[in-house]
Amino acid sequence: MFQLGSLVVLCGLLIGNSESLLGELGSAVNNLKILNPPSEAVPQNLNLDVELLQQATSWPLAKNSILETLNTADLGNLKSFTSLNGLLLKINNLKVLDFQAKLSSNGNGIDLTVPLAGEASLVLPFIGKTVDISVSLDLINSLSIKTNAQTGLPEVTIGKCSSNTDKISISLLGRRLPIINSILDGVSTLLTSTLSTVLQNFLCPLLQYVLSTLNPSVLQGLLSNLLAGQVQLAL
């Protein structure tokens, strides 16, 4: 049987080393490395239904096709990454919730906002505890549309994709031991920054590839509706 005296000693060690653990965990998060970082190209094993995207003739149809394509793609290789110093972080599930569109600041393009939500498991170094966290953030991608002077057809230029730092949140699921709460609270900013960067690096190329497969006339129609004030913020 586990002796009370041993339990007291263990608790004392945990409490006494809490500041050290915070520092070590902070270092681990700062040194987070992706196990298999993706290349610039979209992985071929995602099995994206490009034909479904190309068949869309209007933005509502295209939006539904994009959501279906992204949420049914095999993202297995994008869900695991590890770090140095014993920190392991794994994305358990990830879902694209919606697409929101508004005119760009210059009025000549579209800013697409893509809300994401998911859950991850974090293995704390040195104490071997696994905790679950929920993550939500927004990706923003800009699009500009111009008419080709020779063909008279619309052409789409896909601009920068980034995460909205004002819309990132991480929540701890099933808090238990105070020492674990203290450790995670102490590195919440580091975790937020790391997760947003990793998800942005993984998902932005995929999002931009999907947008590039759409018929330009679909996005031209969306822009025309935005200019006419006929489209709500959430599409």
Curated annotation (Swiss-Prot):
Keyword vocabulary terms for this entry: Antibiotic, Antimicrobial, Disulfide bond, Secreted, Signal
Disulfide bond residue pairs: 161-204
Tissue-specific expression: Predominates in the parotid glands, present in smaller amounts (1/10) in the submaxillary glands and in the sublingual glands, and at lower amount in the pancreas but undetectable in the liver. Found also in lacrimal gland.
Pfam families recorded: LBP_BPI_CETP (PF01273)
GO biological process entries: defense response to bacterium
Top-level division of the source organism's lineage: Eukaryota
Coiled-coil ranges per UniProt: none
Cellular-component GO terms for this entry: extracellular space
Molecular function terms from GO: lipid binding
Location of this chain's protein in the cell: Secreted
Signal peptide (from-to): 1-20
InterPro entries: Bactericidal_perm-incr_a/b_dom (IPR017943), BPI_fold-antibacterial (IPR052507), Lipid-bd_serum_glycop_N (IPR017942)
Stated family: Belongs to the BPI/LBP/Plunc superfamily. Plunc family.
Its biological purpose: Has strong antibacterial activity against P.aeruginosa.
Protein name: BPI fold-containing family A member 2
Gene: Bpifa2
